[in-house]
Every structure is written in structure tokens, then in C-alpha cells.
Regions:
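Catalytic Zn2+-binding segment of zinc metalloproteases
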Residues: 147-165
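Generic hydrophobic alpha-helical membrane-segment signal
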Residues: 58, 113, 133-137
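Short pre-active-site segment immediately N-terminal to the catalytic Zn-binding motif
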Residues: 118-120, 127-144, 197
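Extended, hydrophobic alpha-helical membrane-active domains that insert into or remodel lipid bilayers
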Residues: 1-62
């Protein structure tokens, strides 16, 4: 079945098949933890949505790996991604970009859930706040920077927000000390943000892949 890549839509068959597989994988992972039903619901929801949109690239290994991780080890991050999509819908006009999502193993929204205006945010396999993706610079931000965060969430799974958040807290504290002892001539917020955010290893990884380090 062929579809216009600019349209948010695709295959009922793929939605049903991927939804069923996602539910099966996720519930199997959740069963030993007593979370078979909630994990299964998340796996089914992610599978149905991504299947309909034809997100996973089944023509190469990456697509199978992405689906497997999203439906098992990284299911908490996948759940967060489903929630972020729902919040984007509540906000209104999430503006899904199929050209950056179809067979790209990620879901991209020009608007969507954006807690910090002007910043792109990636939650699980969902990228929101992409902006005007007709501009090459914005497209490269998604393909080279945010895509790294999508895969970080997959590989590190439930550890990802813990590791990222721990650095933010520790880096922020270090930034305060640095400002107080050596860099009082600079804006306090800038020093703290540099240590907490820009020096975060996960951000260094993404900015380096994007070719924008130092940012």
C-alpha cells in the first residue's frame, strides 16, 4: 500500500499487526513485574500508532531493533512518548510531519508538547517542537541531533531519565559553585545552564553528532 509521505496516515493492516506484536512483546516483559496489562496497553498503542503512520523501517535491521526496544526494554520511555503525543493533541494542532517520520523510526511534530518555548523536546520515540521543517537547518536538527536522543532513550531505556536527570542536578550544583568561586562576572543562569545542560554527556553526544559542539 502506498501513501503520500506528507499525509499523516497509512496502513490499517500494519497498524493492526504492529499493535498486536507490540502488545505481545510488552506484556511479556511486564508479566514478571506484575505489569503485563499496562505494559501491553502501551505496546499496543505505540504499535498501532506507529503502524498506521508506517514509522518503523522494516527494510533494515534498525527498524526491527527500534521496534523491539520500544516494545520491551524501553517501554517506560515509549509510554512517556505516548503521553507526550496526547498532551500535544490537548494543546491543539500538533502538526505531525510524516516526511521526517515515515520509515525513520521516530515520530516528529512541528508543534506538539513543548514545555519550553523555542526548544525541541524528544520523549521516547516522539520529537515535538520541530518548527518549520521546510528549512534545511531545522530538518538537520531533527535528523542529526534529536534522532540521537531517540536512540539514547531506546538503548538506555528506564535508566535514561535517571542518568540525564542526575547529571542535570549534579551539573547544576557544580555550576552554582563554579559561578560563586570563579565566574561571578558571567550571568548566573548561563553558567548553571552550561554545566547542567550543555556539558551533559547525552547532549554532548547529540551536539557532536549534529556538528555543533561546542554549541
Amino acid at each position: 500500500m502506498t501513501t503520500d509521505p506528507a499525509v499523516d496516515g497509512g496502513s490499517f493492516i500494519e497498524a493492526a499487526a504492529v499493535g498486536a506484536l507490540g502488545a505481545m512483546f510488552a506484556s511479556a516483559v511486564g508479566a514478571p513485574l506484575g505489569f503485563a496489562v499496562p505494559f501491553g496497553v502501551v505496546g499496543a498503542a505505540n504499535g498501532a500508532i506507529t503502524g498506521w503512520r508506517q514509522v518503523y523501517d522494516w527494510s533494515c535491521t534498525n527498524g526491527f531493533v527500534a521496534f523491539a526496544l520500544d516494545s520491551t526494554w524501553s517501554i517506560p520511555m515509549t509510554a512517556a512518548g505516548v503521553v507526550s503525543q496526547a498532551l500535544g493533541i490537548v494543546r491543539g494542532r500538533p502538526d505531525y510531519d510524516a516526511t521526517l517520520s515515515r520509515r525513520a523510526n521516530r515520530q516528529v511534530f512541528r508543534r506538539g508538547f513543548v514545555p519550553r518555548p523555542g526548544f525541541v523536546i524528544t520523549v521516547g520515540n516522539v520529537v515535538s517542537g520541530a518548527g518549520d521543517t521546510s528549512v534545511p537547518r531545522r530538518r538537520r536538527l531533527i535528523t542529526d541531533h534529536e534522532d540521537v536522543h531517540v536512540w539514547q532513550a531506546r538503548w538506555f531505556g528506564p535508566l535514561y531519565p535517571l542518568l540525564y536527570g542526575s547529571w542535570m542536578v549534579g551539573g547544576g550544583a557544580a555550576g552554582m559553585v563554579l559561578w560563586a568561586t570563579r565566574r561571578r562576572s558571567e550571568p548566573f543562569a548561563k553558567v548553571v545552564e552550561s554545566c547542567a545542560y550543555y556539558l551533559n554527556p547525552f547532549e554532548w553526544w547529540a551536539y557532536s553528532r549534529h556538528g555543533h559542539w561546542p554549541p
